[in-house]
């Protein structure tokens, strides 16, 4: 059950924003306080599974081979990348950047992580897209399905950052639930919890914004 305040504010935002010819993204803008962001321990870097997804198709690439690669393909991932592909992408930075921009998430069998870090870390790292490790105890299909409903919140060294929580045309209660999930996880990751939150705004891509915190 979502908070009435969150639900009311999302309704207010959507009703007060003009209709667009495309499906707008609904984002939250987060402003932190009383944190020294030059200290890595204070930076936010969390991957969060949204209970209601983002309302759009996520592109996922998987570094795998053999049966794992086949299972990933059956699960609907967009690209299966091999050891040879890692080497090729490492040598062709333009192609690597294009793939990094196209895909929302990457998954990799653990034996490829070191090679990926060396060949592609400089491209994937700053984008917050280093692969999610696929350990032997995990099922690749389950990981793909959960990743499709995930967002990553990253502050880097800034006190202000944004994260998408869905699309404007989603059910209002589902959007509110997504927002509360992100904020709950964010507060848990901060040293002083909600006391490190200066403000939180909910906004559409081209519309108005409303203050939640």
From Swiss-Prot:
CDD domains named among the record's database cross-references: Ribosomal_L1
Keyword Ribonucleoprotein attached: yes
InterPro entries, per the entry: Ribosomal_uL1, Ribosomal_uL1-like, Ribosomal_uL1/biogenesis, Ribosomal_uL1_3-a/b-sand, Ribosomal_uL1_arc, Ribosomal_uL1_CS
Keywords: Repressor, Ribonucleoprotein, Ribosomal protein, RNA-binding, rRNA-binding, Translation regulation, tRNA-binding
Cited Gene3D superfamilies: 3.30.190.20, 3.40.50.790
Pfam families: Ribosomal_L1
One Gene Ontology CC term in the entry: large ribosomal subunit
GO biological process: regulation of translation; translation
HAMAP family, per the entry: Ribosomal_uL1_A (MF_01318_A)
Subunit structure: Part of the 50S ribosomal subunit.
NCBIfam families in the cross-refs: PRK04203.1
Membership in a protein family: Belongs to the universal ribosomal protein uL1 family.
Protein's UniProt name: Large ribosomal subunit protein uL1
Source organism of this protein record: Methanococcoides burtonii (strain DSM 6242 / NBRC 107633 / OCM 468 / ACE-M)
